Design a protein with these regions (language model features):
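Sec-dependent signal peptide recognition
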Residues: 2-10
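Surface-exposed short loop/turn segments
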Residues: 105-180
Length: 235
């Protein structure tokens, strides 16, 4: 019986892992571009209509204790998500050996500077109660974005790379579905998260979406690393 429960927990953890992916990669046919002097990170744009706040009882309680309008709340959420992505991208790109800094939208790059920008197509906080109780994708929180990489040339700013990036909370079964095994699996997940935090691999954010933005930055950085290596900018 113990072995069966162990197998169930391992299976649930494997199936329920958060999904992070990149698709629709479009690369301009350019090789051996000059090494960038800096990489400029600009805030990703997001429309208010593309933001879905936390739904269900939890969302109502959270909204009820705030005197602010839904639009202001959406603005706070988008600011945290954008800030999380900026912070993580700067750290990860700098770790690759290229200077990366955050700049305002109106800052114009100089020759051989690279710009990374884009747009969040969807920011969905999901339903935390359904996610924890039912799981299997119910109440899932998710992010969808379009990433655009530009280069400053004597002829102007040109796009050199673009792709879509997605992150979600996964399909982990909730406590009601898993029963006793759910409690054990939840504890196992907590241990994994705890280890990551202890290693300094995680930053605490208020929203699910901001935490996913941090994970999204990992995947975006992977695509950037491949491109940088192809150009000979890094080894």
């Amino acid at each position: 019986m113990k072995r069966i429960m162990t197998l169930l927990i391992v299976s649930f953890l494997s199936v329920g892992c958060a999904k992070i992916s990149t698709t629709h990669i479009s690369q301009q046919d350019q090789t051996a571009l000059p090494h960038p002097t800096r990489i400029l990170i600009k805030d990703f744009r997001v429309d208010s209509d593309s933001i879905q706040m936390a739904t269900g009882l939890y969302g109502k309680i959270k909204a009820g204790i705030s005197d602010e309008s839904p639009e202001i709340t959406k603005q706070e959420l988008s600011s945290e998500v954008i800030g999380a992505l900026n912070k993580e991208l700067i750290e990860k790109i700098t770790a690759l050996g290229i200077t990366a800094v955050h700049v305002e939208q109106n800052q114009q790059p100089v020759q051989n500077e690279i710009i990374i920008t884009g747009k969040f197509l969807k920011i969905d906080e999901g339903n935390v109660v359904r996610r924890n109780l039912i799981g299997l994708g119910a109440g899932q929180s998710s992010l969808d974005s379009k990433v655009i990489v530009l280069r400053a040339t004597p002829q102007g700013i040109k796009e050199i790379l673009s792709f879509s990036a997605h992150a979600d909370s996964g399909n982990m079964p909730g406590a009601a579905v898993m029963g006793p095994a759910g409690v054990a699996a939840g504890a196992a997940t907590a241990v994994v998260v705890g280890v990551n935090v202890a290693k300094g691999a995680a930053t605490t954010y208020k929203s699910n979406s901001a935490n996913q933005a941090s994970a999204l930055a990992d995947k975006i950085s992977e695509e950037l690393q491949k491109y940088f290596q192809e150009q000979g900018w890094i080894k």
